[in-house]
Amino acid sequence: MKKLLSVLLCAVMVLSLAACGKKENAPTPGPDPNGETEGLTVALVVAGKLGDRSVYDSSKEGLDRMVADLGVTPIVIECNNENHDIQMKNAAEKANIVVCVGWEFYNVETIAPDYPEVNWIWVDNATSAPVSNVLNITYAQNEGSFLAGYIAAAVSETGVVGAVGGEDADTINDFIVGYTQGAEYYGTENGKEISVVKNYSNTYDDPAVGKDCAIALNDQGADVIFQIASACGDGVFEAAKEKGFYAIGVDSDQKYIDPEVIICSMKKEVGSSIYDAVKSYLAGDSRFGTTWTADMATGYVGIGYGDSGMTQQVPDEVKAAVEELAAKIASGEIVVETTRA
C-alpha cells in the first residue's frame, strides 16, 4: 500500500512538472498545490505527551490545520519520553511526512536515510550535517527570551528576576542567556540594578517540582519568574498565585491559564512553522536537506500578552519599547547571545 501511494504521489509530481516546466536551480518539487493531497499522511511524533499547553500542543494545532486546510491524513504518536527511535520508525512505516517534535530525536540523522521515500521535519534541533530528506527547524528562542527578560526587569520591584529551566541543556540555556541579556539591557538602559537567578527542575512533567523550584527562586528575591520547563510550568504558575509574584509563560501564549499572575509569554510558533513548511512543500518549495532558523525576523518568535479582555500588568510604554527592541533584533542592530554555534 505504501509503495502504491509513493507511486501515485510521484505520478502527480511528474504531471505537474510536465505542465509547468522545470526551472534551473528550482527547489525540489512537492505534490501539486491545487488540492492533490489525497492520501498524503503526516505523522506527528512528540517526545513527551500532549497536554503540555506548550510546544507539543502547538505542534498538534499545526497538524490540525493541515487536516482542515490541506486535506492530509493525520497520525499522532506520543513517546512519553521513551522509545523515541522505535516510534520514529513506526511513524515512517505509515506516513509520507514525519514531524518529530523535541531535541530527543537526534537519531533521525541515521534513521531518515533508511526511509528515503519519507520526508522528515525535526523541530527544535538540527542534524550535524545536512540529510537530504530532513528539514531541521530551529528557533531563536534566545531572541524572544531577550524580550521576556526586558519585560521581567521592567515589571520587577525587587530587581531580582528568575528562570526555571527543565534541564541544564543547550536548548534550555539558550532561553536563559537571552532572558539574562534582556534583563540586563533594561537595567543598563534605565539605571536599575538587575540580578537574574535560575534553577532546573530536571523533569518536564512534574508540576510539584516546578512549584518547588519557583518558590526557591522567590525566596532569593525573584518577583518575576520565567518558566521554561513544559508541564512543570503549571507548578510555577501555582506558586506565583500562592506567593504573590509574577510569572512568564513559554512557547505558546499561556496567559489564559492564569491572567492574574502570568504577565506575558515568550512564544515560539511551532504549529505555524510546521504547517507552513508542509504547505510550502506541497506548493513545490521544498526545504528538505536544510536547516531553517525561525527567528525574530521571520515572525515565528515573539511575545504574547493574551487578549485585551485579560488583566494587563505590562505597561503600554514597556510594550512599545519591546516592539522597538524586536525590530532592532530582527534587523541585526541588537545581537542576542546564544548557546548554539
Regions found by a protein language model. Give the residues of each.
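Positively charged n-region of N-terminal signal peptides that target proteins for export
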Residues: M1-L9
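A residue-level marker of the well-folded mature domains of exported/periplasmic proteins
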Residues: K22-A341
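C-terminal motif of bacterial Sec signal peptides marking the signal peptidase cleavage site
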Residues: S16-A19
